[in-house]
């Protein structure tokens, strides 16, 4: 079966068409600047040259029509007809408490996703637009929703509740939800295979480190604690997000800078993190380069970040009562040997120790632990699209 995976942002759309017999993509691509001038589709067949298609793309329906046209194009397409596509899997950012797993999309499911808009006002509306476009353009093809939050629905109340009046949870559903769930789920499953152990009994700490970063404690294959919270702003300092703060700082900044609540929220999401501390960039590669050239603030930003990661690993080791493995994934986790070394240095008490030669790996699955390490350190490139496709296949096969 071939499964189309769709990930819609407000003005962009990423897609992959996967052959589930081999679990590999046969085409992937990106639509940029939806609803803006200069919209473009970049289409990459697995065994061909990339195609760049410029067009007026006023909305997500037009974007998906372009994608479908590209997939069946006689020159650079990869299928003879759309009938070869058995199902569509959609990334949906927020499923609230309503969804603890991926689901076949029905009218009731759509309504529930719409009810979660206030929890993810920037993300859920374009996710919904993508689903509606596919329903219109591919009638009769089963559509599946895969939620970023679902994997974390196994967290116990003592992990997801804040120190606020309980009525705020009852009335407004204020609690920790966690994100990057699809990524954490995928790498935890791969880790069990790499360690040649069943998920049951395994204690894992998964570090998804990139422009957005989160850490998850995984026990018996289930998330029991995670660093992102009610929104993706909580937890680690990130590319442009502040991460954990004393809540009183928010009103202090509002008063000092004369900002509205929307403006201060935007500021904490887009102008803080390593960008704010370094003054250089939100891209860790640029910051590592600046540090190597003697930039003090760049070095400081990297030190704060690695300290943050180490602190969370330590606290999650406490929650798990030890760890069998620490996983590094996502752009920074997969590719920065220096960051991995900075984080693991000082975790010897956990039994974690790097083999510095093995740690040079970039973007490939590897056990980078020293032979004597009792807590393994793994690099596992994430593959959220494959995880979405596998969940979609599972639901279609269950009927």
From Swiss-Prot:
Pfam families the UniProt entry points to: Acetate_kinase (PF00871)
Binding site for Mg(2+): 7, 384
GO cellular component: cytoplasm
Bound cofactor: record note: Mg(2+). Can also accept Mn(2+).
Cofactor section: Mg(2+); Mn(2+)
Active-site residues from the entry: 148 (proton donor/acceptor)
Predominant location: cytoplasm
Catalytic reactions on record: acetate + ATP = acetyl phosphate + ADP
Annotated positions binding ATP: 14, 208-212, 283-285, 331-335
Gene3D superfamilies: 3.30.420.40
First-tier enzyme category under EC: transferase
PROSITE patterns in UniProt: ACETATE_KINASE_1 (PS01075), ACETATE_KINASE_2 (PS01076)
GO terms of biological process kind: acetate metabolic process; acetyl-CoA biosynthetic process
InterPro entries referenced in this protein's UniProt entry, alphabetically: Ac/propionate_kinase, Aliphatic_acid_kin_short-chain, Aliphatic_acid_kinase_CS, ATPase_NBD
Site, Transition state stabilizer: residue positions: 180, 241
Classification via SUPFAM superfamilies: Actin-like ATPase domain
Protein function: Catalyzes the formation of acetyl phosphate from acetate and ATP. Can also catalyze the reverse reaction.
NCBIfam families, per the entry: ackA
Family classification: Belongs to the acetokinase family.
Protein name listed in UniProt: Acetate kinase
């Amino acid at each position: 079966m071939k499964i189309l995976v769709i990930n819609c942002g407000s003005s962009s759309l990423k897609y992959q068409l996967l052959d589930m017999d081999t679990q590999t993509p046969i085409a992937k691509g990106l639509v940029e600047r939806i609803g803006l001038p200069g919209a473009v589709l970049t289409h990459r067949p697995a065994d061909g040259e990339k195609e760049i298609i410029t067009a007026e793309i006023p909305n997500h329906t037009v974007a998906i029509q372009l994608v479908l046209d590209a997939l069946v194009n006689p020159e650079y397409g990869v299928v003879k007809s759309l009938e070869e596509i058995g199902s569509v899997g959609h990334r949906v950012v927020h499923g609230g408490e309503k969804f603890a797993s991926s689901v076949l999309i029905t009218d009731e499911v759509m309504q529930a996703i719409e009810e979660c808009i206030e929890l993810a006002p920037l993300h859920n509306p374009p996710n919904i637009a993508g689903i509606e476009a596919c329903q219109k353009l591919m009638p009769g093809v089963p559509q599946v929703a895969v939620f970023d939050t679902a994997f974390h629905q196994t967290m116990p109340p003592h992990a997801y509740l804040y120190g606020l009046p309980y009525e705020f949870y009852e009335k407004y559903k204020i609690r920790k939800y966690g994100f990057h769930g699809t990524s954490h789920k995928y790498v935890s499953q791969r880790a069990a295979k790499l360690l040649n152990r069943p998920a049951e009994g395994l204690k894992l700490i998964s570090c998804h480190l990139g422009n957005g970063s989160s850490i998850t404690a995984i026990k018996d294959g289930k998330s029991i604690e995670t660093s992102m919270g009610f929104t993706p702003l909580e937890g680690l300092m990130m590319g442009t997000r502040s991460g954990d703060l004393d809540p009183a700082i928010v009103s202090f900044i509002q008063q000092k800078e004369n900002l509205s609540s929307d403006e201060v929220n935007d500021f904490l999401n887009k102008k803080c993190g390593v960008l704010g501390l370094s003054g250089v960039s939100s891209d860790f590669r640029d910051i590592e380069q600046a540090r190597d050239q003697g930039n003090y603030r760049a070095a400081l930003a990297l030190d704060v970040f690695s300290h943050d990661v180490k602190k969370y690993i330590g606290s999650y080791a406490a929650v798990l009562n030890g760890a069998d493995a620490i996983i590094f994934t996502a752009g920074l986790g997969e590719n920065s040997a220096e960051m991995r070394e900075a984080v693991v240095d000082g975790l010897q008490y956990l039994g974690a120790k790097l083999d510095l030669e093995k740690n040079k790996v970039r973007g490939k699955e590897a056990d980078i632990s020293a032979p004597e390490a009792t807590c393994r350190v793994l690099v596992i490139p994430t593959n959220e699209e494959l995880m979405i496709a596998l969940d979609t296949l599972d639901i279609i096969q269950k009927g």
